[in-house]
Design a protein with these regions (language model features):
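Short, amphipathic, aromatic/basic-enriched membrane-interface segments that mark the entry/exit
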Residues: 12-22, 63-74, 91-93
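N-terminal signal-anchor module of multipass membrane proteins
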Residues: 1-56, 60
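Transmembrane helix interruption/hinge and helix-loop junction motifs
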Residues: 38-45, 89-98
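Hydrophobic core segments of alpha-helical transmembrane domains in multi-pass membrane proteins
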Residues: 47-54, 97-105
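Long hydrophobic alpha-helical segments that form multi-pass transmembrane helix bundles
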Residues: 117-161
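Hydrophobic, membrane-inserted alpha-helices
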Residues: 28-35, 59, 78-86, 102-106
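Cytoplasmic-side transmembrane-helix entry/capping segments in multi-pass membrane proteins
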Residues: 70-80, 97-103, 118-129
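C-terminal ends of transmembrane helices
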Residues: 9, 57-69, 106-117
């Protein structure tokens, strides 16, 4: 070993592809998504669905019309970004704010740095931070968890007795 060989990462390789890793993370997040749906109801489903659809559509538009390259939505990274963004947002958030967050997450947080693997920050968190700065009132208004249950499990405050 007389020479120092410098090459771009990754330096350790496995048989897993990017697509396989992305979909494995999506499967791992499925239980958390189900719990959020049970806890926050239809609002959580709408936020997750709008976020995922907006992220996938934004990535498709940017790769097709701005970069003029084949679409990269098949790798699952836009779906994962949309899911992570949706899980970071209140379930009562209006759909148009979610779309703005998805556009910022994919457009600014991911694609402006060259796409998958080139971003310096997590794109979903870039979208969340932007929304928190742009819409602080809506982003800090969280609905009561478990309001869809018809019973009270415990009371943790003073009672009239």
């Amino acid at each position: 070993m007389d020479r120092l060989i410098i090459s771009p990462s990754p330096h350790i390789h496995s048989g897993d592809s990017v697509e396989r890793n992305m979909y494995a993370v999506l499967i791992a997040l499925a239980p958390a998504c189900l719990v959020s749906l049970v806890t926050f109801g239809l609002g959580a489903f709408i936020v997750l669905a709008v976020s995922v659809l907006a992220c996938v559509l934004t990535e498709w538009v940017i790769t097709k019309y701005l970069y003029k390259q084949p679409s990269t939505i098949g790798d699952g990274s836009a779906i994962l970004t949309g899911l992570l963004l949706g899980m970071n947002l209140p379930s009562s958030l209006p759909w148009w704010i979610i779309v703005i967050g998805a556009i910022v997450a994919i457009g600014v947080g991911k694609m402006s740095f060259g796409g998958l693997g080139g971003n310096i920050f997590n794109p979903a968190l870039v979208g969340r931070v932007f929304l928190l700065i742009a819409y602080p009132a809506q982003m800090t208004l969280w609905p009561k968890a478990g309001q869809y249950f018809s019973y009270t499990d415990a009371v943790t405050s003073a009672t009239p007795l």
